[in-house]
Each structure stands twice: as structure tokens, then as C-alpha cells.
Amino acid sequence: MDIITGNVGWIEVICGPMFSGKSEELIRRLRRAMIARKRVEVFKPVIDNRYSNDEIVSHGDLRMKSQVVASAEEITARIDWRSEVVGVDEANFMGEGLVEVAQRLADSGKQVIISGLDTDYMGRPFAPIPELLALGEAITKTLAICVRCGNPAKHTQRLRGSDDLIVVGAADMYEARCRRCFEPGIPKQTELEFVKAKRQG
């Protein structure tokens, strides 16, 4: 988003299912800000160590150095207030405290760019993204490709594991599915069983 100028802060939200390019889009915007010689700071939650401990990493392996925080509140304690652009990846691991932090940063004149899942593995709104969508100035909704039928996918399908709301995983535990192919929760039929059944059918 390039229409806001001057010392006015704002919030941009990039949301969608896993494998839809959210982190990739976040990195792209942050790199553009760096090219524009803006002071940029990047944060990610400590729980997200799937690909790197101290980098934002997209599923396509784009990388950017980031600070690691245990909570959203830690961002305000660690940020250099001279920064002009603040990026936050994996917002769902930050908790609802991120809403107040993002508001405070934007109110202080910063461009805040946040990426995260908008729905959980049950297909329900996944905090804090819904509230950030209501408060933000710019929203980008990304779609993935359904691995079953090839249609646009808006859901993150959990394939195995527990019923806990937050379970960190990648392609070994999740896949993108469209509205028709999505099964809230953990599906009874595994992907291997699905492929076998398709071949036999």
C-alpha cells in the first residue's frame, strides 16, 4: 500500500491459509521499505522454529532476519522507536495482545505490516487477525491451491496431531484445501488413503 504519506502510521494485514504466500508477501513489502531507505524492524514468535530460529522463512524459502519474541508485549520493550516500518510474521502465535501493540505502533506513526492465519484448523476465525482486520487500513487476502482438486484454497487442513488450537507444523502436518474439500478438524481419511481410494475408484 503506497497511498499514505507523511508521519501518519497505519496497519496492513496479510492473511489467508498456510501455503498461500503470506510470509513471502510480508518479506517483499519489507524489502521494498528497505530499498526506500526506511528503518525496518522485523519480529517473529519464538514458538515458530520450523525453518529457522532467527529468520522469517516462507515455504518457498525466502528469508529475512528477524528478532524473536515470546509475546507481543515484548515487541514494545525491544523496538527501536526510530523505526519507521515494523513487520510481524505468524501473528497467531502472538496472542490477542498484538492488537494493542499494533495500534500503539501505528498511533506513533509507524507502518505496521502483520501476516497470519485468518482461520484455524476448524475453519473458525483465528485471533488476533479478525480484530486486526477491523482496525487495519489495508487488507490483503491470499489464497493457496487446494491439493485435492486444484481450486483456490482458503482453508488450512490439519492432517494429524492433537486437537490443540496451536500446533506448529509445516507440510508434514498441514495442507491447503478449498471450501469443498476442507474437513473441519482432523480428517478421518489420511492423504495416503485418499490417493489409494482415488486410484482404485
Role assignments for model-derived ranges:
Residues 1-81, 120-131, 141-144, 160, ...:
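Conserved P-loop
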